[in-house]
């Protein structure tokens, strides 16, 4: 799979997008705040899990490059790894 294709992450985000549309409808219908808060929490978790999956994949790619590319390319891969780690 090319480095920027993440079908599982896209699927998760599309599901979260659909969930958000449902929450908007719930708000417009005047549904109870507790239900809205629960659903918003679920969307937050879904987005967080998508982010983690994306970052974990990227970390794996960086580690592969760092291990197979000595010298400047390996060091560059480690710098990229450190840069993305702050989003975990």
Feature names for model-found ranges:
Residues 1-88:
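Solvent-exposed interaction patches of small proteins and small membrane subunits
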């Amino acid at each position: 799979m090319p480095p920027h294709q993440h079908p599982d992450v896209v699927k998760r985000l599309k599901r979260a997008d659909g969930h958000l549309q449902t929450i908007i409808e719930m708000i417009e219908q005047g549904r109870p705040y507790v239900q809205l808060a629960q659903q918003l929490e679920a969307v937050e978790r879904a987005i967080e899990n998508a982010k983690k999956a994306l970052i974990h994949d990227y970390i794996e790619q960086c580690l592969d490059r760092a291990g197979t590319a000595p010298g400047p390319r390996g060091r560059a891969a480690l710098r990229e790894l450190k840069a993305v780690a702050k989003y975990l």
